[in-house]
């Protein structure tokens, strides 16, 4: 099993969710986050004063998939989140030792 975490632009969330759903990926966790990378920040004017906005709003999604479903999940996220501009985000994949469904006690891939 794999944990897939992606940091994407907020306006791409619905497209990513729909793309994952089409591939049979059920359930994801969404967290609003802020960050910066190559995109860096920008300057804004507020009441005549300049402010540097270093951290930009992003969305972090987390899904757990079987090893067999990993490639299609990553590809779905990448294709749906891509705009071709700096700041599109990143996808991280890690091994997952164990999953337990709290309600039933099922574990492993049965809990997905």
Regions found by a protein language model. Give the residues of each.
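Positively charged, small/polar-rich N-terminal and surface patches that mediate targeting and assembly
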Residues: 1-112
